[in-house]
Amino acid sequence: MAFTPVGAALLFFGARGPRRQILVPLALLAASDVILTTMVYRYPFSWDHFVTWAWYAGMLWLGTSLKQNAGALRILGSALAGSVSFFLLSNFAVWAAWDMYPRTAGGLLTCYGAGVPFFRHAVAGDLLFTAAMFATPVVVHAVSEWRQKSGDHIAA
């Protein structure tokens, strides 16, 4: 099950985060990947992690393209592009890095087929979390403006 906010958070940070701190989430995610993989799950570290980290960087970069033009369709299209690219890249990396599937076209297709159930959850999570993250500041701003216009203030 891959229902996570990671892609959405990277898009949002790329779009709304300070430019000088753009590498902070990438560094934190990479460090947590290494710690979880080697110390918690006790799996060997493999080059396929670099594929995931490249995807993280790509999502941050894609988010920066939303700084100037963050319309709803562009945001959701970016989230969907993130889901598809992660599915393609991560499954290719698993096929290439590990001996789980034969190194043939059939083995690659089998690997992609095994990833489809995760992909459905990833798309749902990416779209839901992206919509929530990008909508929240808009809604908060609209409510704040409405309250100011109506004279409704919360006592501090």
For the regions a language model picked out, list residue spans one by one:
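Membrane-embedded alpha-helical hairpins and interfacial helices in multi-pass inner-membrane proteins
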Residues: 71-146
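Internal catalytic-core helix/loop-beta-alpha segment
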Residues: 52-83
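Structural signal for the C-terminal ends of transmembrane alpha-helices
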Residues: 13-19, 58-69, 135-144
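Interfacial aromatic-anchored transmembrane helix boundaries in multi-pass membrane proteins
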Residues: 1-4, 28-62
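Hydrophobic transmembrane alpha-helices
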Residues: 1-16, 20-23
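Hydrophobic alpha-helical transmembrane segments
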Residues: 22-27, 49-54, 76-80, 123-124, ...
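Mature catalytic domains of secreted/periplasmic carbohydrate-active enzymes
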Residues: 16-27, 34-36, 70, 81, ...
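Short, charged juxtamembrane terminal tails flanking transmembrane helices
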Residues: 146-156
